[in-house]
Amino acid sequence: MMYAPVEFSEAEFSRAEYQRKQQFWDSVRLALFTLAIVAIIGIAIGIVTHFVVEDDKSFYYLASFKVTNIKYKENYGIRSSREFIERSHQIERMMSRIFRHSSVGGRFIKSHVIKLSPDEQGVDILIVLIFRYPSTDSAEQIKKKIEKALYQSLKTKQLSLTINKPSFRLTPIDSKKMRNLLNSRCGIRMTSSNMPLPASSSTQRIVQGRETAMEGEWPWQASLQLIGSGHQCGASLISNTWLLTAAHCFWKNKDPTQWIATFGATITPPAVKRNVRKIILHENYHRETNENDIALVQLSTGVEFSNIVQRVCLPDSSIKLPPKTSVFVTGFGSIVDDGPIQNTLRQARVETISTDVCNRKDVYDGLITPGMLCAGFMEGKIDACKGDSGGPLVYDNHDIWYIVGIVSWGQSCALPKKPGVYTRVTKYRDWIASKTGM
């Protein structure tokens, strides 16, 4: 039996054609959707694989070598001396030049000179080198890459210092050894490679909401507290037993048994706590004029340096900061005039202001003496405030931090033409040395 062909009316034919096309495009859309899902899964797997495989970590090396075209100077043995600082910076710049434009360029992070020693041929250098490589790489494999890059640079680059190639030694070290070596130097923030500084364009005020500091960001900051009364002043750790602060912090109570010092980014709970053994005020401190507003506090027992607790460098007495130099002030003080003490450490970038400007009649009218330093902004947007007294004003020089000022006085907080006034630390280096031996 033959089947007769099915006949459609014009309307039925249009409907059937529409359904056929709809089924076709549904299939296309399903195929495209499936491909998209597969692609997304593939990309996700690729990203995960990338981060698993390319999970970088820090590798640390202790390098030693001889430099033969310079002579050893006695002050190279004093890490806070201008000679040690300048020579160290020259060596660190040279390391950067050697490695950043080499086969390991993208992997080099930074270097820190640990020691300069005398040698018959010149000067022995001991330096920590820090690199970032995939965690799957071995320290020995990386060592060979570093040595190859160095030797190639010695052949092709004109360097300011002559490295004796046979003397070069490179030893992998772990993070604990690296920290111990860096602890022998002052002014180093262990977390600085992971922690950005407050932006220089920040409009945050030290009063009215200045930026909160992270743990370990300012590891020399201390809180001086009267037992039973809480936080009174800030201070700066300059050795494992000595704090530098302001004399006016003790005008009501100079009894060391009534004071404690704590460290860390919060007052409560503190990371480290110490009793006070001795308080030394400058013999010529004048409360009426704020002259010689400087004091030393000796801890009953020394602190152990760590990522959270470190000492800041004392500047050479010859260091001069030009106007508009960026410096940082930190403390637990009020964020509004006459406001409460803050439990969390805060930070702000300010700029140095010349003594001539600060002594203008419309500013402080001649009250700024050679032992004082002005910092802030003439428009008054950032300033230290109540509770910040005694705390540090610090300056960054090639990732080494120096205390250049001690929060001392000012007219109210953050008023226009009334910047903060700090004790100028460079003027008191001899006094500090006479009391501490530093």
Swiss-Prot record:
Disulfide feature: 233-249, 358-374, 385-413
Molecular function GO labels: serine-type endopeptidase activity
Transmembrane segments: 33-53
Keyword Transmembrane helix: yes
Extracellular side: 54-438
Membrane topology (Cytoplasmic): 1-32
Keyword annotations of the record: Disulfide bond, Hydrolase, Membrane, Protease, Serine protease, Signal-anchor, Transmembrane, Transmembrane helix
Classification via CDD domains: Tryp_SPc (cd00190)
Superkingdom assignment: Eukaryota
Cellular localization per UniProt: Membrane
Membrane topology (UniProt): Single-pass type II membrane protein
Domain spans labelled SEA: 57-175
Active site: 248, 293, 389
Enzyme class: hydrolase
GO cellular component assignments: cell surface; extracellular region; plasma membrane
Major site of localization recorded for this protein: membrane
Peptidase S1 domain segment(s): 206-437
GO biological process, alphabetically ordered: establishment of skin barrier; proteolysis
Assigned protein family: Belongs to the peptidase S1 family.
PANTHER family linked to this entry: ACROSIN-RELATED (PTHR24252), SUPPRESSOR OF TUMORIGENICITY 14 PROTEIN HOMOLOG-RELATED (PTHR24252:SF17)
Function: Probable serine protease.
Name assigned to this protein: Transmembrane protease serine 11F
Gene this protein is translated from: TMPRSS11F
